[in-house]
């Protein structure tokens, strides 16, 4: 799911006061409060690393009696620079080796805690109810799919073709055991978990005129994820035209980053980066603003990423999936409520 507006909007003052105000009323306020606490805790953790994130000085919750501001807020450092737009001097698209060294964490290893995936503040700006903690990557991925299927069944997602969309997420759910398995059981990092910024597009990066990374902002929906997601192909290194046109493959940017990691001696991370784009497709999913014909191209890309023939007859596939899941009560309710769809 892409580019849905968040249920909260952040505004920056010249003094670094970030105000979080709901676009909707009722229960959203408690979720806003959760995001405030989550972002503040994340920023305080990042202060112990070399990640160029804003320093956080204070936060307040709207309902607290000692909050004199009146709204939920975080008081943080204002970062210099401008938002990276994937372009720059001499056509420079990607950060070079010096950029990566400047922004490098002292060691790309896991959080100093026992191996669980913590509560998720959000998944792609849609579901703000905290999920987790999870004991395994499999549980984490399953929660993501289940939340989407619940929203489809409720009529909140893909109302024009809910049955087809639900079947796609059932397909993704069937692939989770493969996603959760590690490429090499001897690689320590593949069974540990890492803080990951929710935005893969790159506009959270602040750069100077030479495109040196000077800051990373907007941490309010950061989450803790398995290594394959943290260090695998993301939207920063994707070719979006391929994604929207049903083409699945690693890009030159995926391979370029893998080569850089290998050159720096991070062979395990390089292996994750150049493995495949399954997780990129898994979390990208479908686009809520697309027509059925456009969505079908995304589905074909998902099929290709997971080893299916992208030119599979979609009607035959749908019939097979319906037969396999005829005892899925939620699916049957969707058909009864919305019809079988295209």
Question: Residues of each region from the PLM?
Answer:
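Short beta-strand-initiation
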Residues: 7, 200-201
């Amino acid at each position: 799911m892409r580019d849905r507006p968040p249920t909260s909007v952040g505004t920056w003052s010249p003094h670094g006061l970030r105000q979080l105000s709901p676009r909707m009323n009722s229960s959203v306020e408690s979720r806003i409060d959760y995001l405030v606490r989550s972002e503040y805790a994340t920023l305080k953790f990042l202060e112990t690393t070399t990640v160029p994130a804003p320093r956080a000085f204070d936060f307040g919750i709207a309902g607290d009696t000692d909050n004199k501001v009146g709204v939920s807020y975080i008081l943080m450092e204002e970062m210099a620079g401008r938002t990276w737009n994937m372009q720059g001097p001499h056509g420079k698209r990607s950060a070079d080796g010096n950029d990566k060294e400047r922004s490098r964490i002292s060691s790309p290893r896991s959080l100093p805690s026992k191996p669980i995936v913590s509560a998720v503040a959000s998944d792609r700006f849609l579901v703000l109810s905290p999920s987790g903690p999870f004991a395994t990557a499999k549980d984490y991925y399953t929660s993501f799919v289940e939340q989407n299927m619940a929203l489809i069944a409720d009529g909140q997602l893909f109302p024009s073709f809910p049955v087809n969309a639900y079947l796609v997420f059932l397909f993704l759910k069937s692939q989770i055991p493969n996603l959760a398995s590690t490429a090499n059981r001897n690689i320590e990092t593949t069974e540990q978990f890492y803080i990951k910024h929710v935005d893969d597009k790159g506009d959270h990066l602040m750069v100077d005129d030479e495109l040196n990374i000077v800051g990373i902002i907007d941490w309010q929906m950061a989450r803790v994820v398995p290594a394959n997601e943290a260090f695998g192909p993301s939207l920063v290194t994707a070719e979006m035209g391929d994604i929207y046109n049903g083409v699945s493959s690693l890009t030159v940017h995926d391979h370029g980053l893998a080569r850089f990691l290998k050159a720096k001696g991070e062979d395990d991370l390089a292996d994750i980066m150049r493995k495949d784009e399954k997780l990129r497709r898994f979390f990208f999913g479908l686009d809520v603003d697309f027509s059925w014909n456009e969505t079908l191209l995304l589905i074909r890309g998902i099929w290709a990423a997971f080893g299916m023939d992208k030119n599979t007859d979609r009607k035959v596939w749908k019939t097979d999936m319906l037969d396999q899941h005829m005892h899925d009560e939620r699916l049957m309710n969707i058909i009864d409520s919305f019809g079988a769809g295209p």
